Amino acid sequence: MNIRKNSKSVSKRFKVTSNKLILYKPASKSHLQEKKTVSRKKRLCRVKRIKVVDSKSIKLRYMF
């Protein structure tokens, strides 16, 4: 019997809430911050929701 596994890359990058919303943190916050404005750095810190169009493909890879 085959066991279905989560995609490791998807499970590291996305979190599914109890309401089945998929959340992620945007990239570009880890380095080279001197040239970025304060408002841009604040915006990059926020957790964002995945668009409905992309959610189906992520849910297939993220089973639980």
UniProtKB/Swiss-Prot annotation:
The keyword Manganese does not apply. Keywords: Chloroplast, Plastid, Ribonucleoprotein, Ribosomal protein. GO terms for cellular component: chloroplast; ribonucleoprotein complex; ribosome. One of its GO terms (biological process) is translation. It is found in: Plastid, Chloroplast. This is Large ribosomal subunit protein bL35c. One of its GO terms (molecular function) is structural constituent of ribosome. It comes from Cyanidium caldarium (Red alga). Its main location: plastid. It holds the Pfam family Ribosomal_L35p. SUPFAM superfamilies: L35p-like (SSF143034). HAMAP family: Ribosomal_bL35 (MF_00514). Belongs to the bacterial ribosomal protein bL35 family.
